[in-house]
């Protein structure tokens, strides 16, 4: 009798173990893994105090990396290669190998993020923790290893693509010259921040041919005359600032 009970217990344990391992796919396909990874990138962007244009560049390349590593999970989605300027064909998954594309996407996103921010250690610490969560879900070693490797391949291609967008070249260009005359823009209190990214137009665009496709109208002509359009617009801004409410 005892041997029968022991056999039943072993069988039950085996069934539970198999069921738990079979559930890893559902657990690992949870979009929260990707959402949390992007949130971590946001937190580091804020910590490192990147300007909005530079932050937008980080978001663009990291999310393209995640998409490119994940889109093979659904045949309805296609690669952005050939659609975004300068992005050529990316590595494809090896036929016959098992993958968790959610893990591949998270790994690709975080690897690209580490290449673009100052606080690499913060991203690395988060990455180590979230990869352990994938592993703890019961993902088979073969799937785990192949998914990490594929995410790394995609990340490498995206990092190489990003390196050619002329961002690095703009780091050594001259700052925006601030004029002394009354018509010139000047940094304002309280931070007196310098003009942000005056050479951003020199970066490779993602989709449009150039900024000329959406050329804005020229700014209102400066004038201190109280009847001028410039004076009216400037006063409207001042009045709005003076009448702000807590909301």
Label every PLM stretch briefly.
Residues 20-247:
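Acidic/polar surface patches and capping/hinge elements
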Residues 1-24:
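Bacterial Sec-dependent N-terminal signal peptides
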